[in-house]
Amino acid sequence: MMTRVRSAVSSIIGGIMASGTGAHDSHPDLPLRFPYSRPDFLALSPDEVECSADHISRPILILKEMKLPWATGYAEVINAGKSALNEDQACCEVVELRKRPADPSSVSYTPSRRRSSLPSGDVLDTIHNPEVKELDFHYWALFDGHGGSGAAVFAAKFLHLHIEEQLQEVLEILQDPGLQPPTCLGEESPNPQLHASASGSQRGLSRAASLRGAAGAPGSPNTMAPRFFMEKKIKQESLVVGAIENAFKEMDAHIARERCAYSISGGCTALAVMFLLGKLYVANAGDSRALIVRAGELITMSSSFTPESERQRLQFLAHLQPSLLGSDFTHLEFPRRVTKREIGKRMLYRDFTMNGWAYKTVQEEDLKFPLIYGEGKKARVLATIGITRGLGDHDLKVHDSDIAIKPFLSCSPEVQVYNLCQFEHGADDVLILATDGLWDVLSNQEVADAVSGFLGNCDPDDQHRYTMAAQDLVMKARGILKDRGWRIAGDRLGSGDDISVFIIPLMYGTQQPQPS
């Protein structure tokens, strides 16, 4: 086993390991859940899809016509040969929220479409009730696949439907912006003014009225029981965040169920943005990134989750459940591999409780391969995978072993919130979403400067400028093919990975784009 691990590590050092390697127990005899394709909004023919997979010329694909909400721009390019297909996927939708009669808690419940073709009774009630406010949310998402495109394609089809399903459970609360979410559904939400009035009336009740059980008297059926404990006040924003978090969890479980009947290869990172009730919710599980450029200021809206950034979480899990490591890995981190001749010596190490380093006496068990090995983009979990959050990877194992990787991978996203209504946004203020193929070669500041510089030279009334800016950004990261490979500005190595970019103008969060 150690020989196999050393062989895997030599591949890492050689720089040829992809972010998701190892053994995926695929099921070649099972049918595909969905055929491979590029995003629907690109409207590519089968011939165009085939041409887009040219690893030599690497054509940059953009929108043929402006059809995405908010005049959103999009561009993508395939990798330089890392995988046969572009394993990135993208999705953009406007989803209506309506209460459905189906029971979302049912195990067999699976969202299958965005809108019902025939209105249900609940929907008809909503249509005929003018007091009920209909809601919808705008949705953009990028999925960076590894070990195959199956999980990314599947997540692109379903994640927004799982978010819809979760939001439907709190729809009636969200329809009333002034309503504080009740602690228990079915209870009236506390209203301070109402409580003050009720308490004043209650004090005025006579003892006789109390004994008779008059309405509003203590002990009457219509009186809420007094509470003698503190109760947190939860904001509606937190309900939306919780819905997104649960949707990611349900999406991951959905993949796990469906892979028993269909071939769903690999896993994927997920970066999703939702606009609802004046706020942007940015949810990230993986190493894609989101950032806002507003009046020249750069605002990061996501964190990258890698073996290095999540070292302590991974080490703590391995400490609690050492069986997950098999007999060949240790959860401790050392500056380099420990050798036999160093047994008994004092060596630098780091455990899950530590940000810094300390010395320990090396023991024989420290010769095991470390849970996290390598630095930067070459850091790997169990010598196998370079990301720590995402969807799928249910069958991924350490090469030629039975050690599962999935227990160390989290599907939980980090969700950040940006209130669009708090700021005035101009035509050059944008939200940029991109997979790691872009960020591998360009810093946040370089990306912000490139987009600001490009938009600054465009007609502010030209709504195609955002797609052109996305194309320019992809070109800057891909570079130009030369004798020594793809090169970008400064003769640096260009990105050989798949690259997908959304550029979303923020001013349309409060106003709709007018036709050009």
From Swiss-Prot:
InterPro entries in the cross-refs: PP2C (IPR015655), PPM-type-like_dom_sf (IPR036457), PPM-type_phosphatase-like_dom (IPR001932)
GO CC annotations on file: cytoplasm; mitochondrion; nucleus
Biased segments, Polar residues type: 190-202
Catalysis: reaction(s): O-phospho-L-seryl-[protein] + H2O = L-seryl-[protein] + phosphate; O-phospho-L-threonyl-[protein] + H2O = L-threonyl-[protein] + phosphate
Record has Mitochondrion as a keyword: no
Example GO biological process: signal transduction
Residue ranges of domain PPM-type phosphatase in the record: 106-506
EC number: 3.1.3.16
Protein name: Protein phosphatase 1H
Phylogenetic classification of the source organism: Eukaryota, Metazoa, Chordata, Craniata, Vertebrata
